[in-house]
Structures are given as structure tokens and as C-alpha cells.
Amino acid sequence: MATKSPVNPKVPLVQEPDRDEGGAVVLERRTQKTKPPHMYQVVMLNDDYTPMEFVVVVIQEFFGKDLEAATRIMLKIHLDGKGVCGVYSKDVAATKVDQVLDAANKAGHPLKCISEPVGF
């Protein structure tokens, strides 16, 4: 008994290629839709030992805030127990957290800083 080889149906191209006068094939490019990256907020947590002035300086230095904005964030941290210093992509937020923790550690302060996803 002879077996038939399966017939492979032709898979159509996205769009029929156009040929220019030189015989080259030109395919149309599909645009890709990419989602924006997930964002993370960098949050400083209050403690009873880190001086307020140090927190203000750290916010100015690592988050680019002016004195007034840094003071507002520091007061939010002090009064509410935590405050958002900025919103960044995951890698940038992790770097900011590391910078804050390193500066606090070098200065001998127990300041804590975390990053958490926004909108989850």
C-alpha cells in the first residue's frame, strides 16, 4: 500500500510583496504595540532616630526635589509614617532605594526605604 505524503498548505504572507523595478521584494512592516513598563513608587518609612534634616537632604540629593518639596515629603513621612519620594521604572526605583539605604547606613541612621508597584 502506497502512502501519500501530506500536502503542506501554503502559508500566506502578511501581505503580498510588492516588487520594484529592480526585482527586489519589499515587505510591509507591521507596527508592534508595546505596553509601558510597570511603575514603582519609592517610599521612605518613618523612624524615631533619623534626623529630619538628613531625610530632607537625601530627598533633595537622590530625588532631585527642591527644599520646599523635600520638606513637604519629609513632613508626610514624619506625620503619616511613610511618604512617596518619586515614581520610576522598576530598575530606577531599585537603584534609588539602594542609594538611600547606602547613604543612611554610611551616616549611621536606621532610615528605611522601599519600592512598591503602583496601581496593583
UniProtKB/Swiss-Prot annotation:
Offer one Pfam family short name for this entry. ClpS
Q: Which InterPro entries match?
A: ClpS, ClpS_core, Ribosomal_bL12_C/ClpS-like
Q: Which domain of life is it from?
A: Bacteria
The residue stretches assigned to a coiled coil in this entry are none
Cite the residue spans of the region called Disordered: 1-20
Can you supply a Gene Ontology BP term from the record? proteolysis
Q: What does it do?
A: Involved in the modulation of the specificity of the ClpAP-mediated ATP-dependent protein degradation.
Record's subunit section: Binds to the N-terminal domain of the chaperone ClpA.
User: Which family, according to UniProt?
Assistant: Belongs to the ClpS family.
Please give the name of this protein.
Answer: ATP-dependent Clp protease adapter protein ClpS
Q: Which organism is it from?
A: Albidiferax ferrireducens (strain ATCC BAA-621 / DSM 15236 / T118) (Rhodoferax ferrireducens)
What gene is this protein translated from? clpS
